């Protein structure tokens, strides 16, 4: 039996593959490109982690795939950004939380087992700064 996160990850990939095929049959070029790009993006974190030697939990991979599905597939292909005024806010909130957690883990891994221990406020500040920086870069990408 597969864990729920593995099922979610496979379901998202299957949905994107089917949608890309349907868009190809209908001749909707932009939808084909976006769904195939989203499908490729769901595989990149695991590929990157294996090359670097990290082990990412299935739940983390499923969360990334869910975010890619929400931003690219639902947001762009199904125009959720235009249909729901709060869609962009919800995705920015989710990405800020995710990048904050990622920043915390990166800083925690840097200082773990080292003789230089970072105080908790410094770890929190660096995590916050990473989340804000990535959010600012995302806004630049979004409006460019």
Where are these regions (language model features)?
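Bulky hydrophobic segments
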Residues: 1-140, 144
